[in-house]
Amino acid sequence: MLADHQIPEQSMDEEERTSSRGWMREFKYPSNLRDITEEARISLSSVAHCGGVDELLHESSELAWRTNMSPPHRALFTFSKKTDISYVMLFLDYSRDESYCPQEVRIDLGDGTNDWWLKMYRRVDQPKGWVKIPIHDAFGNPLRVMSLQMTIMKNHEKGRDCVVRHFRVLGPFRSRYDSMNRMILGPSAVLEARPGTEPIKDAIMNHYQSMR
């Protein structure tokens, strides 16, 4: 449950950029994506006072996940079915959090907590804002998983606890595995995963609808 917090006033532009919806500004075609974070069951390896799942998912970056143990720190996202994932988005702020700010992150992907089949590593130096981590195969398609785990391996300045201000999981707006997509588009169903191809796909869909 969220405690009472005094959230500083910000300009509307800055408030939007730093909000949980601010990830949209990192993409040319944000309408191709959707936020699927809250479709998952989320568990955190440790939580400091007033810094748990509710704070991690809060709209404001003034609230955050705050850990309460030595690293590594883990956030586990478990989906109820196989789910297409396109990006993991982190909002980190070294200027505010300093030694609490993550520097080395690992993303594990799999079909369960005992079946991790891909590990991805990312290092960020003194980030201030959104960090984009693509979750794609060699052809640029989203990866289909049931579980995703972020492990914070190391903080800046060898800090112990960490602060993560936003964590969002993004999937494609339309899955290439949708039965309607496969029936109408055939091989073109993969277009939804490619940046800038939404107009092509819409044209195909509109043609189909006009012929029914």
UniProtKB/Swiss-Prot annotation:
Database matches in CDD domains: APC10 (cd08366)
Reported phenotype of the disruption mutant: RNAi-mediated knockdown results in both viable and inviable embryos, but eventually animals display germline maintenance defects and become sterile.
Keyword Cell cycle: yes
GO CC annotations, alphabetized: anaphase-promoting complex
One Pfam family linked to the record: ANAPC10
Classification via SMART domains: APC10
Keywords associated with the record: Cell cycle, Cell division, Developmental protein, Meiosis, Mitosis, Ubl conjugation pathway
InterPro entries, A to Z: APC10/Doc1, APC_su10/DOC_dom, Galactose-bd-like_sf
DOC domain ranges (all copies): 12-196
Function: Probable component of the anaphase promoting complex/cyclosome (APC/C), a cell cycle-regulated E3 ubiquitin ligase that controls progression through mitosis and the G1 phase of the cell cycle. The APC/C complex acts by mediating ubiquitination and subsequent degradation of target proteins.
Oligomer status and interactors: The APC/C complex is probably composed of at least 12 subunits: apc-2, apc-10, apc-11, cdc-26, emb-1, emb-27, emb-30, mat-1, mat-2, mat-3, such-1 and gfi-3.
Protein name per UniProt: Anaphase-promoting complex subunit 10
Lineage: Eukaryota, Metazoa, Ecdysozoa, Nematoda, Chromadorea
